[in-house]
Amino acid sequence: MSIKIKSMLILLILLTITLVFSDTFQRLKELYENTKTIKVSFVQKVKYEWYPKADVSKGIFYASKGGKVRIDYYSPDRVSIFVDRKKVVLVNFEEKVVYIESIKRNTSPVIASLFFLSEQPEKVFKPIGEFKEGDKTVLLLKPLKKDENVKEVKIYFSKDGEILGLKTYDAQGSEISINFIEVVRNYTPTDELFKPSIPEGFKVLRYE
């Protein structure tokens, strides 16, 4: 599973969790339940245990209840990712390659439970703690099932209960952090937003 695909699925985890592990997040639950569509501008950093310099990407995340998801990375490379309950489609505009991967190839128990098998979040994650970092509230979660891709997750909230971002760690010590720059809820998507298209002349690689 590529870093970008794994990072995208980590975002899905964030948007799937209802986060009702304490009264502090009751308002967040209500906000989540009233959200039909969401658009998030974000900055993503990936730090590897074996490499000192972080990989930094910028992009926009779109999602609609019912499993429609799109991510457009525009820096440093232009990459678009589409996902539904059957496949993941990654369009790399720099390499002129389209990767199509079956959901059946997914190897993450956390991702499978939350997104593909629609398990309730409280059956997948265990809350470890809740603490303050400056004016932010941090919720620490660990998966109930052993998962090499997701060892623990930190989710950051403002004092108003808005999600500011998250950090996740894998078994090898790598860290993915995603900071939310702008969040728009309940917009009206175009009919084409969640439909992947293969640009003319691009090579197509399928992994079924």
From Swiss-Prot:
Any Pfam family hit: LolA
Alphabetized UniProt keyword annotations: Signal
S-S bridge residues: none
Signal peptide per UniProt: 1-22
Name the UniProt record assigns to this protein: Uncharacterized protein aq_1483
Organism phylogeny: Bacteria, Pseudomonadati, Aquificota, Aquificia, Aquificales
